[in-house]
Swiss-Prot record:
<protein>
    <recommendedName>
        <fullName>Putative uncharacterized transmembrane protein DDB_G0290657</fullName>
    </recommendedName>
</protein>
<feature type="transmembrane region" description="Helical">
    <location>
        <begin position="34"/>
        <end position="50"/>
    </location>
</feature>
<keyword id="KW-1133">Transmembrane helix</keyword>
<feature type="region of interest" description="Disordered">
    <location>
        <begin position="46"/>
        <end position="74"/>
    </location>
</feature>
<feature type="region of interest" description="Disordered">
    <location>
        <begin position="1"/>
        <end position="26"/>
    </location>
</feature>
<keyword id="KW-0472">Membrane</keyword>
<dbReference type="GO" id="GO:0016020">
    <property type="term" value="C:membrane"/>
</dbReference>
<feature type="compositionally biased region" description="Low complexity">
    <location>
        <begin position="47"/>
        <end position="74"/>
    </location>
</feature>
<keyword id="KW-0812">Transmembrane</keyword>
Length: 74
């Protein structure tokens, strides 16, 4: 039981741990920021197109403000 788990853990960790983890962290941060901005723009466009949904536009504006604050803090 301990042998295969140990081997698999070392293989996965040493094989793709350090390189993939570091690159994944940087790429993940950049992708998260870009995805958040694109989602904000898409949400604003969607809320602006249907003017009848006043509730949706108000909720989206509040969420976009909160997300912008979080992005600035980060």
């Amino acid at each position: 039981m301990n042998g295969p788990r140990y081997a698999h853990s070392n293989y996965g960790g040493n094989k793709g741990g350090p390189s993939n983890s570091t690159s994944g962290v940087f790429a993940g941060d950049i992708r998260c920021q870009v995805s958040n901005k694109s989602i904000m723009l898409i949400s604003l466009k969607i809320t602006n197109s249907p003017n009848s949904n006043s509730r949706g536009s108000s909720s989206s504006s509040s969420t976009s403000k909160s997300s912008s604050k979080t992005s600035f803090t980060q």
